[in-house]
């Protein structure tokens, strides 16, 4: 065990690091709130134009991943309720579930998780990597020239969630 002075230095360094992490989280939360407000203003203050999700997104697109192949798996517990990055993954043989790649957006389809905001924007995979997750996810992928992050902000929009909960 280090002497008391060394322990105090370690505690001080640890506190500095955790304070920085908390500050960066607040900055990220503020940036996401700003982006969401901009998104809302841009897309929900316009004339009402009806369209389906299939008109603007690829919904549950096919992604190549054979059964038994080792791949990263993102369980429901890894989807955040705020922020966009999943909190972890495991590697295991693929035996079913939705498949996705970088640029795809995931949203939970089951009511409690949808209400709680379980969603993620996937941007942490290696190039060309296909991952998989719960059959209770809906995957949105970019269609035409729509930026892939559009779908993340769409699913984080309270009007969209309220609409989705009706089904």
What are the residue ranges of the model-derived segments?
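Non-catalytic DNA-recognition/assembly elements of restriction-modification systems
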Residues: 4-66, 82
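Sequence-specific dsDNA recognition surfaces
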Residues: 54-108, 113-128, 133
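Anionic group-transfer/hydrolysis microenvironments
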Residues: 34, 77, 110-111, 138, ...
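Basic, amphipathic alpha-helical recognition segments used for DNA target recognition
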Residues: 1-8, 53-64, 129-167
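Short, well-ordered loop/turn and helix-capping segments at boundaries between secondary-structure elements
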Residues: 44, 112, 116, 157-161
């Amino acid at each position: 065990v280090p002497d008391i002075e060394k322990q105090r230095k370690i505690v001080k360094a640890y506190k500095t690091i955790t304070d920085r992490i908390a500050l960066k989280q607040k900055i990220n939360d503020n940036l996401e709130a700003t982006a969401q407000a901009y998104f809302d203003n841009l897309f929900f203050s316009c004339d009402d134009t009806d369209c389906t999700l299939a008109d603007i997104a690829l919904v549950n697109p096919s992604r190549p991943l054979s059964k038994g192949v080792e791949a990263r798996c993102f369980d429901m517990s890894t989807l955040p309720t705020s922020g966009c990055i999943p909190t972890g993954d495991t590697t295991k043989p693929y035996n079913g579930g939705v498949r996705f790649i970088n640029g795809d957006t995931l949203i939970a389809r089951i009511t409690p998780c949808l209400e709680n905001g379980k969603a993620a924007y996937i941007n942490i995979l290696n190039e060309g990597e296909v991952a998989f997750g719960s059959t209770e996810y809906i995957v949105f992928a970019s269609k035409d020239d729509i930026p892939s992050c559009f779908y993340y902000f769409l699913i984080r929009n309270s009007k969209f969630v309220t609409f989705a909960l009706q089904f």
